[in-house]
Amino acid sequence: MVEDSQETTHFGFQTVAKEQKADMVAHVFHSVASKYDVMNDLMSFGIHRLWKRFTIDCSGVRRGQTVLDLAGGTGDLTAKFSRMVGETGKVILADINDSMLKMGREKLRNIGVIGNVEYVQANAEALPFPDNTFDCITISFGLRNVTEKEKALRSMFRVLKPGGRLLVLEFSKPIIEPLSKAYDAYSFHILPRIGSMVANDADSYRYLAESIRMHPDQDTLKAMMQDAGFESVDYYNLTAGVVALHRGYKF
């Protein structure tokens, strides 16, 4: 039970004290880190690769630029950005969770992604970088786990260079009603079973489904980005809104 005097937030469908959420999310990702890539393929039927490819294509990243892959996990986007920025550029893979960061580092080194990638354990709400550092920031399937999303968006805005852009790839709200119902059935009944069988962790994947439902919808997130200072904010619905890619600029 959370005392009324405490500031609260949501952890899935639970109401928890704000200071508790980060530890609870950390526990989830410590638990799932070793099976993260396998579960991504199973949960999305491999479609997450297309969503990430679209994000890369919309990034405008060029040779010599500096990119922050925030909540970068096992490094899918970092691997692509590393090739795009080349030897004269740099990619920082940042994640608040050390288990996920370790998995990302091992995976990328095993496939030969070295030299222009750095690894930083960082909280999105208080990024440890100077103002105006990055040409591009991406956060892929990570924003919904952040306790204070508005604070994180302001932090991202601060470390972007003028002319830089933020891309937020995140689960969103399906725009077709029959799909929405089928998606709910899959998320709440099938997904935890897959998590139990493959990762021996139904609870973490039940949290995943709940956290998606609690995440702001497309237009709400667009407004939040605008409030944080981003301009020319737009979004693309992917797979009929199951996922949305938001993009905003710092001018």
Swiss-Prot record:
Reactions accelerated catalytically: a 2-demethylmenaquinol + S-adenosyl-L-methionine = a menaquinol + S-adenosyl-L-homocysteine + H(+); a 2-methoxy-6-(all-trans-polyprenyl)benzene-1,4-diol + S-adenosyl-L-methionine = a 5-methoxy-2-methyl-3-(all-trans-polyprenyl)benzene-1,4-diol + S-adenosyl-L-homocysteine + H(+)
* Enzyme Commission (EC) number: 2.1.1.163, 2.1.1.201
> Which InterPro entries does its entry note?
SAM-dependent_MTases_sf (IPR029063), UbiE/COQ5_MeTrFase (IPR004033), UbiE/COQ5_MeTrFase_CS (IPR023576)
In which pathway does this enzyme or protein participate?
Answer: Quinol/quinone metabolism; menaquinone biosynthesis; menaquinol from 1,4-dihydroxy-2-naphthoate: step 2/2; Cofactor biosynthesis; ubiquinone biosynthesis
**What gene is this protein translated from?**
ubiE
Q: Which PROSITE patterns match?
A: SAM_MT_UBIE, UBIE_1, UBIE_2
* Organism of provenance: Salmonella typhimurium (strain LT2 / SGSC1412 / ATCC 700720)
Q: What is this protein called?
A: Ubiquinone/menaquinone biosynthesis C-methyltransferase UbiE
The family note in this entry says:
Belongs to the class I-like SAM-binding methyltransferase superfamily. MenG/UbiE family.
Q: Which GO terms describe its biological process?
A: aerobic respiration; menaquinone biosynthetic process; methylation; ubiquinone biosynthetic process
Keywords (alphabetical) are:
Menaquinone biosynthesis, Methyltransferase, S-adenosyl-L-methionine, Transferase, Ubiquinone biosynthesis
Question: Which GO MF terms does the UniProt record name?
Answer: 2-methoxy-6-polyprenyl-1,4-benzoquinol methyltransferase activity; demethylmenaquinone methyltransferase activity
**Role:** Methyltransferase required for the conversion of demethylmenaquinol (DMKH2) to menaquinol (MKH2) and the conversion of 2-polyprenyl-6-methoxy-1,4-benzoquinol (DDMQH2) to 2-polyprenyl-3-methyl-6-methoxy-1,4-benzoquinol (DMQH2).
Enzyme type, top EC level: transferase
Q: Does the keyword Transferase apply?
A: yes
Entry binding sites for S-adenosyl-L-methionine? T74, D95, N123, A124, S140
